[in-house]
């Protein structure tokens, strides 16, 4: 059985993710107390469920101590367990709570316990509680994602087979800031920029004309080779840490041309060595065709 645990910061997008998983054919349970995870998962497997997703919202360190114990037991039973952790910047979380006028769960809990927590304090406390989870989870920063983009990325995550180590190559634009969840960051702003070619400016690194332009530049090929060599050298050491996910971010100025192309090429390079996911932070959902590089 495939089991996906959806968790993360309050306001990070867990509800959207769990709805997308349900639409993808998963048997979904929202807001499950961690102590019920093991018996429910065992029962689902016994009843022949092939794919299930459970959303867990931790409000104390003890919650995930129970969850980790359950996950170890499930893995020993041969159940394919993966954790999807959704996060966002403090500013974006504040905006989302203000927009929906909902109270943060930890603020409500603190009130019942006779204490007061501001929204900023509740968010900071939640980050502290959830920090250990990020070491074994696939972390997705939803700060600049539209709901449609988040649903698309969840679809991609589901399609990706489980592997001992999954590499995520993520392009981004420096003018919008670095992604929150990044293990390695490579700056490709020194490469020739298609933006200054009028016919290429409105296109992206997924378009064949831009890809052709960059493929003909020796510096681009050299940069890709150097990044690939670095990753290949250190990949065994990351595997040795029993990590499940490694996020490699590639940045250019706007996240539209160079970083997109380089991320795509690196994803192809490592497709045979690990599970790979390629995503492009700066591109809106309507600029993400299934495969614009098919002509290469």
Regions found by a protein language model. Give the residues of each.
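Compact, charge-rich alpha-helical regulatory domains located at protein termini
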Residues: 1-12
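C-terminal accessory "lid"/substrate-recognition subdomains
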Residues: 119-246, 271, 282-288, 293-296
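Post-Walker A alpha-helix
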Residues: 17-18, 263
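Conserved glycine(s) of the Walker
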Residues: 12-13, 257-258
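Conserved phosphate-donor/acceptor-positioning beta-strand/loop module used by diverse small-molecule
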Residues: 77-102, 140-143, 181-194
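Conserved nucleotide-sensing/catalytic segment adjacent to the nucleotide-binding pocket
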Residues: 22-75, 294-296
